[in-house]
């Protein structure tokens, strides 16, 4: 009973190795039809390990080459960004990185100051905006008060003009009446003077006639 179980386990192991080998061969682009014995299998494993190690070394070398090329490119760009002074060619990678660190710190400080100034300017802008709105409301109120006062002033001016016109008319009527009354009084005075004069003339002529009648001698003379 134990022998068949061992045989089955061995067959399963060989089948598993066969499938694993086929998968590896499929990955590398070649296939084998028959299973190998243990020696051949060990030789293939060593060869595959050596191939893997060589391929991994070449891959690592290629990656390292690309990494160094990228690092050189980044260092050249960093030299253009960081102020190094007149002796920029003599700087090592370490000194370049240290200067870059200091430059970054300086830029961060400048950025903080700029942010603080921006916030302060924004606060001042909000304050000035509120002041401007307040002045606008105050100006509107003053304009309305000024327009009301000007309308009241114009109404009072019109009333004063009406009063002046009425007083002028009254004075004109007074002057006309006084002039007419004075002319009438002058006319009456002249008429009375004329009547008096006529009365005096009449009386003098009567007296003369009476005297002549009483003294006929004077008539003869």
From Swiss-Prot:
It comes from Xenopus laevis (African clawed frog). Gene3D superfamilies: Helix-loop-helix DNA-binding domain. GO terms for cellular component: nucleus. It is found in: Nucleus. Expressed primarily in cells that have undergone terminal differentiation including notochord, floor plate and cement gland. This is Max dimerization protein 1. Signal peptide: none annotated. Residues 193-221 have a biased composition (Polar residues). Component of a transcriptional repressor complex together with MAX. In complex with MAX binds to the core DNA sequence 5'-CAC[GA]TG-3'. Antagonizes MYC transcriptional activity by competing with MYC for MAX binding. Binds to the TERT promoter and represses telomerase expression, possibly by interfering with MYC binding. GO terms for biological process: negative regulation of transcription by RNA polymerase II; regulation of transcription by RNA polymerase II. The gene is mxd1.
């Amino acid at each position: 009973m134990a022998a068949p179980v061992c045989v089955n386990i061995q067959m399963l192991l060989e089948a598993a190795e066969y499938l694993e080998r086929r998968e590896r061969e499929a990955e590398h682009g070649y296939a084998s039809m028959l299973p190998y014995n243990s020696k051949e299998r060990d030789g293939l494993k060593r060869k595959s390990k050596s191939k893997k190690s060589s391929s991994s070394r070449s891959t690592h070398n290629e990656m390292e080459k690309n990494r160094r090329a990228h690092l050189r490119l980044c260092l050249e760009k960093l030299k253009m960004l960081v102020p190094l002074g007149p002796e920029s060619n003599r700087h090592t990678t370490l000194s370049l990185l240290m200067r870059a660190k200091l430059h970054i710190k300086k830029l961060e400080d400048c950025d903080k100051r700029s942010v603080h100034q921006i916030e302060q300017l924004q606060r001042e802008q909000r304050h000035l905006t509120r002041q401007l709105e307040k002045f606008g409301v105050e100006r509107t109120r003053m304009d309305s008060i000024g327009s009301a006062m000007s309308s009241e002033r114009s109404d009072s001016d019109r009333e004063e003009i009406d009063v002046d016109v009425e007083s002028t008319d009254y004075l004109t009527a007074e002057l006309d009446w006084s002039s007419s009354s004075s002319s009438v009084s002058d006319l009456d005075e002249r008429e009375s003077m004329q009547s008096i004069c006529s009365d005096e003339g009449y009386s003098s002529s009567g007296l003369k006639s009476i005297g002549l009648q009483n003294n006929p001698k004077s008539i003869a003379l």
